[in-house]
Amino acid sequence: MSKILVSYFSASGITKKVAEKVATAINGDLFEIEPKEKYTKNDLDWTNKLSRSSIEMNENIKPEIVNKVLNLDDYDKVVLAFPIWWYKEPTIIDKFLEENDMTGKKVYVFVTSGSSSIDSTYKSLQDNFPNLIFISGKRFTGAESEEDYKSWLV
């Protein structure tokens, strides 16, 4: 049986809840992609052009990550989970992918969003990291069944 890492970034807690459900359903190890400086509610105000998230996304600023995956060689598959920001992945995800060599790993992407499609996000990842093997992309809300999570990761 292959070993699966479920890595996630969650600023508001929504993606974390879904990642926990996915990890339980597929018997994966959970890993939080944690920014050195936590996000506040004001940081996440996408309507404010001066908010931290707006500045990071508009100026491609990649926040520092406090923790590291201990040994990626232990995993055959990596699930990468995050909320959609500005129709793409948050810049902390780019930082995570730059800092962790996932060459040869199958990377399964899922996102959380109230309404945005995963299409432009998935394309952004493929464009920014052409050497990685992105298997599939899925948008989850947290209302899915355990079977939905299991069948997605085949």
List where the protein language model places each region.
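Glycine-rich, N-terminal phosphate-binding loop of Rossmann-like dinucleotide-binding domains
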Residues: 82-83
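Acidic catalytic loop of the alpha/beta-hydrolase fold
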Residues: 86-87, 115
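N-terminal beta1-alpha1-beta2 submodule of the flavodoxin-like/Rossmannoid cofactor-binding fold
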Residues: 1-77, 87-89, 94, 98, ...
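Short, glycine-/small-residue-rich phosphate/pyrophosphate-handling segment
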Residues: 108-145
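P-loop/Walker A phosphate-binding loop and immediately adjacent motor/lid segment at beta-alpha junctions
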Residues: 50, 105-106
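Secondary-structure boundary/capping positions in well-ordered alpha/beta enzyme cores
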Residues: 29, 103, 132-133
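Short, conserved loop/helix-junction motifs that constitute active-site signature segments
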Residues: 72, 98-105, 129
